[in-house]
C-alpha cells in the first residue's frame, strides 16, 4: 500500500512541478493512473512513492509518505528500492551496464543471487517478456523503445511489491505498448500495487482501477475507472487529456505545397554491429510535406534520421537535394535534427541563448514570438536542462524553426507531451511546412501522426513496406499494431 497524508513538496531549485496538500491511498493490489497536464505534479508523486524525494531530489517536504508500512523519509533508499521498482520516462537514467543481459539481472545480482539462479531467471524472463532479440546486445545500440523494454525487464526481474511507472509508453511503438499493457495486467493479477503517471492513457483503460486527475499540484478528481470512461469526450479535452480511445483520434494532415521531389533518398544501406539496419531504402519527399516515419522499435527509423542529417558515419547510398547529391557535410548544413534524447543537444545557460546559438544577428522579437507559441516565453531566462522533458522537446522544435534549415527531422517530438503541448508542437510543425520546408517525423504517436502528417512511411527490417496518405486511419492503426 502507498499512503500520502497531507503531503506538500516544492523543489529547492524551482517552485514548479511540486504538490500541495496531497492525500491519496493506493491500496495493495490496486492499479492507479495519475494523469493531468504537464507540470501538474504527476512525476513528483512517483518520486515521493519511490523515495527519490527526499533522498535524491531536495526541497521543502511536509506530511507523511508510507510505502508498505515504511516511512519514506526515515527509511534508507536501499530498503525502499527492494519494495518499490520504478521504470522512468528516460531509461538511460537507470542503466548501470553496457550489455542487456547484465542489465536485466543487475538488481538480482546485487541481492546476492547465485550465478546459476541468475542464468535461470534470465532465461525465464526472456521467454515471458519476449526478449530473445534483445539478449546479448550493446545497450547503447538499442532504439529508445528497446531501452525501455530492458529497463522494465530489469525492474520486473527483482519482483518488487510496488511498481511505479513514469510515462512508460513514451518511446514505445503500438505493438510494444500492447505488450507493456499485458505485462502491467499480469503484474496486477499477481497482486502488485501499481502507480502509473501517463499522458497516453488509451492503452490503460481496461487495466486501471482508479484514475487520479491532477492540476496545479493538487488532486482535482479521484474516480473509479468506470466513471472516468463514462465522461464525455468534450470533458476529456477540457481537462487537457489525450484520447481514451484511438478510434476518436482526429485525422486530416496538411496539404503538400508542391510534388517536386525536392529530397530524394536512393538505396540507403547501413550495417551496425554486424546487423543490417537499413537495406536499400529509397523514397522522395516534396516541399511542404510532413512525413511520418513509423515502424516497430529497432526498425531503423533513428538510423535513417542520422543518415539524412549527415550524422551517421558508416553507410552507403545517395541523398539528393533538388537533384544534386549531398555529402555528409552538406547534409549537416542543410538539415536540423531534434533528437529523441533532446538533452544532448541543448548547450547554453538559458532558453533565450539556446534560441540564438549560432545565429549571427538573432532577432530577439522573433525569438520571443516563437517561444510564446509553445508557452515557453516565461522560461526564457531558465537553464534549458532545468525544464521538464516536454518543455525541452518544445524548445528544440523552436530552435529548428529559428535556425532556418530546410530539411527538418524530428525524432519523437511529442514523447512525454500532454494534449496542449502536443497541439502546440503540431501548430509549429504546420507553420514550418507552410514555409516550404521538408519535415520528416519519426513517431509512434498516432494522435500526432493522424493530426498533421501528409504521408506515413512504414519501415520494417530496414525497408519501406508501406507508403500511405495521412487519411487512411484504419489501415494505419492496423499496421502500427502489427496486424498487417
Residue ranges and their predicted role:
Residues 50, 309:
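Helix-to-loop junction immediately C-terminal to a conserved catalytic motif
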Residues 58-70, 317-331:
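Conserved ABC transporter NBD signature motif
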Residues 116-134, 364-379:
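Conserved ABC ATPase "signature" region
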Residues 138-142, 146, 383-387, 391:
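Conserved ABC ATPase signature
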Residues 156, 400-401:
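ABC ATPase C-loop
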Residues 163-166, 408-411:
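Catalytic Walker B motif of ABC-type/P-loop ATPase nucleotide-binding domains
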Residues 198-199, 443-444:
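H-loop/switch region of ABC-family ATPase nucleotide-binding domains
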Residues 218-240, 463-484:
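Conserved beta-strand-loop-alpha-helix hinge in the C-terminal portion
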Amino acid at each position: 500500500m502507498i499512503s500520502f497524508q497531507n503531503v506538500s513538496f516544492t523543489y529547492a531549485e524551482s517552485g514548479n512541478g511540486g504538490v500541495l496538500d496531497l492525500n491519496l491511498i493506493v491500496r495493495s493490489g490496486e492499479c492507479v493512473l495519475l494523469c493531468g497536464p504537464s507540470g501538474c505534479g504527476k512525476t513528483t508523486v512517483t518520486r515521493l512513492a519511490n523515495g527519490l524525494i527526499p533522498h535524491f531530489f531536495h526541497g521543502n517536504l511536509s506530511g507523511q509518505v508510507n510505502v508498505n508500512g515504511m516511512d519514506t523519509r526515515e527509511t534508507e533508499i536501499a530498503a525502499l528500492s527492494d519494495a518499490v521498482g520504478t521504470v522512468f520516462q528516460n531509461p538511460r537514467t537507470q542503466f548501470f551496464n553496457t550489455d542487456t543481459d547484465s542489465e536485466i539481472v543487475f538488481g538480482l545480482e546485487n541481492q546476492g543471487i547465485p550465478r546459476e539462479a541468475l542464468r535461470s531467471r534470465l532465461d525465464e524472463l526472456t521467454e515471458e517478456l519476449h526478449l530473445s532479440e534483445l539478449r546479448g546486445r550493446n545497450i547503447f545500440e538499442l532504439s529508445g523503445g528497446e531501452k525501455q523494454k530492458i529497463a522494465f525487464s530489469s525492474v520486473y526481474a527483482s519482483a518488487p511489491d510496488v511498481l511505479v511507472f513514469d510515462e512508460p509508453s513514451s518511446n514505445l511503438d503500438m505493438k510494444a505498448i500492447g505488450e507493456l499493457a499485458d505485462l502491467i495486467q499480469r503484474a496486477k493479477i499477481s497482486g502488485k500495487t501499481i502507480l502509473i503517471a501517463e499522458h497516453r492513457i488509451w492503452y490503460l483503460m481496461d487495466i486501471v482501477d482508479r484514475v487520479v486527475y491532477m492540476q496545479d499540484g493538487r488532486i482535482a478528481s479521484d474516480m473509479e475507472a468506470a466513471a472516468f470512461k463514462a465522461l464525455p469526450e468534450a470533458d476529456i479535452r477540457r481537462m487537457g487529456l489525450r484520447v481514451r480511445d484511438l478510434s476518436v483520434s482526429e485525422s486530416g494532415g496538411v496539404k503538400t505545397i508542391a510534388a517536386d521531389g525536392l529530397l530524394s533518398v536512393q538505396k540507403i544501406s547501413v550495417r551496425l554491429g554486424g546487423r543490417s539496419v537499413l537495406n536499400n531504402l529509397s523514397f522522395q519527399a516534396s516541399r511542404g510535406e510532413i512525413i511520418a516515419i513509423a515502424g516497430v522499435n529497432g526498425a531503423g527509423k533513428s538510423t535513417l534520421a542520422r543518415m539524412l542529417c549527415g550524422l551517421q558515419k558508416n553507410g552507403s547510398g545517395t541523398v539528393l537535394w533538388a537533384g544534386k547529391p549531398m555529402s555528409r557535410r552538406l547534409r549537416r548544413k542543410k538539415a536540423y535534427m531534434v533528437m529523441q534524447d533532446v538533452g544532448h543537444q541543448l548547450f547554453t545557460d538559458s532558453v533565450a541563448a539556446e534560441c540564438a546559438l549560432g545565429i549571427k544577428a538573432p532577432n530577439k522579437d522573433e525569438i520571443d514570438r516563437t517561444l510564446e507559441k509553445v508557452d515557453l516565453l516565461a522560461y526564457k531566462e531558465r537553464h534549458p536542462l532545468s525544464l521538464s522533458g516536454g518543455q525541452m522537446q518544445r524548445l528544440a522544435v523552436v530552435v529548428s524553426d529559428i535556425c532556418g534549415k530546410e530539411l527538418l527531422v524530428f525524432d519523437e517530438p511529442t514523447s512525454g507531451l500532454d494534449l496542449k503541448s502536443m497541439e502546440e508542437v503540431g501548430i509549429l510543425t504546420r507553420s514550418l511546412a507552410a514555409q516550404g520546408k521538408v519535415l520528416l517525423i519519426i513517431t509512434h504517436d498516432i494522435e500526432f501522426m493522424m493530426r498533421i502528417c501528409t504521408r506515413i512511411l512504414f519501415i520494417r527490417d530496414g525497408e519501406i513496406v508501406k507508403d500511405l496518405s495521412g487519411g487512411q486511419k484504419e489501415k494505419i492503426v492496423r499496421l502500427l499494431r502489427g496486424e498487417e
